[in-house]
Amino acid sequence: MKIAVYGKGGIGKSTTSCNISIALARRGGKVLQIGCDPKHDSTFTLTGFLIPTIIDTLQSKDYHYEEIWPEDVIHKGYGGVDCVEAGGPPAGAGCGGYVVGETVKLLKELNAFYEYDIILFDVLGDVVCGGLAAPLNYADYCVIITDNGFDALFAANRIAVSIGEKTRTHLLRLAGLVGNRTSKRDLIDGYVEVCPMPVIEVLPLIEDIRISRVKGKTLFEMVGSEPSLNYVCEYYLNIADQILSQPEGIVPKEIPDRKFFSLLSDSYLSPINDGKQGKNQENLLGFTMV
């Protein structure tokens, strides 16, 4: 099974991906996480350091694939999760999608791509071009990370459109949304009411999730010294269980951008029309409709 994780930049995809990877491994799967971001920090909380990238290794070998061994590019992470960082071209040059393709090509050359029960692609930022959608070419499922805010849900909607486009030629389905670090879910619920899709899990607004990233540890590793965090790990285990159940998934319905703006702005502005909480809701909106 191959899973692509997408979401707005900075929403917590890598932190969530690492914890999901460990949860999948805890359920008995042999897991590989592939970071698809030039920052090459996807697997940081699994390994505790920035591992060498595929592109770095290929360049050091002058792109002679036959000189590269699995241990050159596959690094062991916490919980038995194997880790790969694709890396990327220099800033302002090249295509991230090409790098993902080279990564998969090399792993196939090493007979490693099909050795895993689950491969999780952690993909950078929003989908703005075909290159960044490249991991969808290999995925069985896509999981979108969001929160209860406008920007994250707007990005989620754009990603859903990309998934719908890919389903025309690939056996890809959207597994659902994961809400990350949010105390409310009203906007998430409003969105999935108009664009039906599963909400796999909503993670609570817990500061330790953010702190884990700074510490370079997953929540599962932090539990060793902070047993009180064990309940947070149950959220990730629930996500893993739902993924492992091989859900039917969906082909997302496309919502045009203007309709999406109206949908969420109405959610904020309705209380204003009622004369209730107007000022607070306006501050939450964070933009002006023109």
Swiss-Prot record:
Subcellular location: Plastid, Chloroplast
EC number: 1.3.7.7
PROSITE patterns named in the record: NIFH_FRXC_1 (PS00746), NIFH_FRXC_3 (PS51026)
Cofactor binding summary note: Binds 1 [4Fe-4S] cluster per dimer.
GO term, biological process aspect, one: light-independent chlorophyll biosynthetic process
Catalytic activity: chlorophyllide a + oxidized 2[4Fe-4S]-[ferredoxin] + 2 ADP + 2 phosphate = protochlorophyllide a + reduced 2[4Fe-4S]-[ferredoxin] + 2 ATP + 2 H2O
A molecular function GO annotation: metal ion binding
Pathway given in the UniProt record: Porphyrin-containing compound metabolism; chlorophyll biosynthesis (light-independent)
Main location group: plastid
This protein's UniProt keywords: 4Fe-4S, ATP-binding, Chlorophyll biosynthesis, Chloroplast, Iron, Iron-sulfur, Magnesium, Metal-binding, Nucleotide-binding, Oxidoreductase, Photosynthesis, Plastid
Chain sites annotated for binding [4Fe-4S] cluster: C95, C129
Keyword Nucleus recorded: no
Cellular component GO terms held in the UniProt record: chloroplast
Requisite cofactors: [4Fe-4S] cluster
Top EC class, one word: oxidoreductase
Assembly notes: Homodimer. Protochlorophyllide reductase is composed of three subunits; ChlL, ChlN and ChlB.
Entry-linked PANTHER family: LIGHT-INDEPENDENT PROTOCHLOROPHYLLIDE REDUCTASE IRON-SULFUR ATP-BINDING PROTEIN (PTHR42864:SF2)
Function: Component of the dark-operative protochlorophyllide reductase (DPOR) that uses Mg-ATP and reduced ferredoxin to reduce ring D of protochlorophyllide (Pchlide) to form chlorophyllide a (Chlide). This reaction is light-independent. The L component serves as a unique electron donor to the NB-component of the complex, and binds Mg-ATP.
Family named by the database record: Belongs to the NifH/BchL/ChlL family.
Name of the protein this chain belongs to: Light-independent protochlorophyllide reductase iron-sulfur ATP-binding protein
The organism of origin for this protein: Cycas taitungensis (Prince sago)
